[in-house]
A protein has these predicted regions:
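Positively charged, helix-rich recognition surfaces that bind polyanionic ligands
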Residues: 1-196
Length: 196
């Protein structure tokens, strides 16, 4: 599990600075050289981080002889959303699509199959109970606090891991393979890796 705190912190810092500078502009002014420079600096730093992250992911796939990478993505995911001042500063301008494009070309170069799949209802459905991934009136498991999912089988799992397994389940319809992954135990002890 890659730690996204560095990306979020950088993005929030730049967005806060840009917002501060915009508040100092006169009414008829839309931008300034300083704001444009900050946008460029943020974009360059995020591009660098995404290149490094995509390279690390692809290297892990090669080291572990994995030929397929499944990625969840919803088109228009962050378009016209308002998550509140703090979350907008942190998340909205992080280009997940850019990361996917870097993964795509790096995977193609070495023959790894990249599968991009939509991820609706993957965070709400209980992956450990193999709950059908669709809209339900009541879901088997539930998120009990930020980042932690309580499965209906009585186990706790990181919410991101639950969602990731469900994204994989949407692509791999083989319940035997999914059961092997669940029974391997690594889902309950993910290793957090810093990007940089």
């Amino acid at each position: 599990m890659f730690n996204g705190k560095q990306i979020k912190a950088k993005n929030q810092y730049f967005n806060k600075e840009i917002s501060r500078l915009k508040s100092c502009l006169s009414n008829n002014q839309k931008s300034s050289k300083q704001i444009k420079n900050l946008y460029n600096k943020r974009n360059n730093q995020l591009t660098d981080i995404f290149h490094k992250l995509s390279k690390r992911i692809v290297n892990l796939l090669v080291e572990n002889k994995i030929g397929n990478l499944v990625v969840g993505y919803n088109k228009g995911w962050k378009d016209s959303i308002n998550l509140g001042k703090r979350n907008n500063q942190t998340f909205v301008s992080i280009s997940y699509e850019k990361l996917i494009n870097y993964l795509k070309y790096k995977c193609e170069m070495i023959g790894i199959n990249l599968i991009i799949n939509e991820e609706s209802y993957t965070s709400k459905c209980d992956s450990l109970a193999l709950e059908e991934i669709k809209k339900h009136d009541a879901y088997l498991g539930k998120r009990i606090k930020r980042g932690l999912f309580q499965s209906s089988i009585g186990k706790l799992i990181y919410a991101d891991v639950n969602g990731s397994l469900n994204i994989l389940r949407k692509v791999v319809n083989d319940s035997e393979i999914i059961s092997k992954i669940i029974n391997s135990g690594w889902l309950f002890r993910p290793i957090r890796v810093n990007i940089l």
